């Protein structure tokens, strides 16, 4: 699967590594990718209890604490780490809160419908990325108790290449849409730090980026 792309990216990201080391990384990537595919398909029948045991959210009380301080809506940022698809079920630990996931529709309609089904099976909702700002303004206005999950490492569209930085030895554009939305609506931002414990088991530690985005540079 996309072998030439994988090899090109590994070589550009780790120029100091030998050919043997790059092949080891390549093998590790494909092993993990295979696990990701199998685990994601498992979402079609895994129980919520089993999912939350395998994708363990360490400190969900952070959201409860912020809600007690008067906040009703939050932005959760995470990357394509571990198995990000599994954490739609883990976030049901947020009591009395709706879970929304911002997603980019797939070109293949059948696969798009499949992934929406898997992501919403435990009661969360999907919002298309182009509708994110409008829908979040509505959620804020309606004072809906909710958390909104963004994948922070998506590549921006050509019209939204506003912020660049060096990442893995390459100039890389990053999304700044969530930052603009958080500042405009004054929504707390939390990063979900994902770790792989062992095969088929992950943990997420919630780390507060800011509870006062309008005051954050």
Please give the residue ranges for each predicted region.
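Residue-level signal for short amphipathic helical patches enriched in basic/charged
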Residues: 1, 17, 94
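Soluble catalytic domains of membrane acyltransferases
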Residues: 44-217
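Short, surface-exposed acidic
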Residues: 14-26
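Catalytic machinery of carbohydrate-active enzymes
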Residues: 2-3, 20, 196
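General structural signal for alpha-helix termini and helix-helix connectors
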Residues: 12, 16, 212-215
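A transmembrane-helix-recognition feature enriched in membrane-embedded lipid enzymes
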Residues: 1-12, 28-48
